[in-house]
Swiss-Prot record:
Part of the 30S ribosomal subunit. Forms a tight heterodimer with protein bS6. This is Small ribosomal subunit protein bS18. Binds as a heterodimer with protein bS6 to the central domain of the 16S rRNA, where it helps stabilize the platform of the 30S subunit. One of its GO terms (molecular function) is structural constituent of ribosome. It comes from Elusimicrobium minutum (strain Pei191). Keywords: Ribonucleoprotein, Ribosomal protein, RNA-binding, rRNA-binding. The gene is rpsR. Residues 16-33 have a biased composition (Basic and acidic residues). SUPFAM superfamilies: Ribosomal protein S18 (SSF46911).
Amino acid sequence: MSEEKIVNTEAAPEAVAERPARAERSERPERPAKGPFGKKRFESRRKVCKLCAEKIENVDYKNFQFIKSFTMDSGKILSRRITGTCAKHQRQIASAVKRDRNLAILPYSLPKK
């Protein structure tokens, strides 16, 4: 014995009430140029990739003084957000740092003092 659900397809469509129009939003006042303590707000400049600016196509692992400028004192690689390099050159810098570490030109990490 199978139970079948009977669906009433001839139900009368209910009257759909229209929604009232949305109230107009008031415009926000413009923010002042000064911060909360009266100081001027800090606007950071957009960082530009050094390598793109100097039109360097490939990062050379032999130029370890240049590559060392993209690492912290502890030996970690600095992020793109800090250095301002583009994605292409950040990948090249990372591989050059890893190659220099492998060749013992750069340290993996410096001991804590």
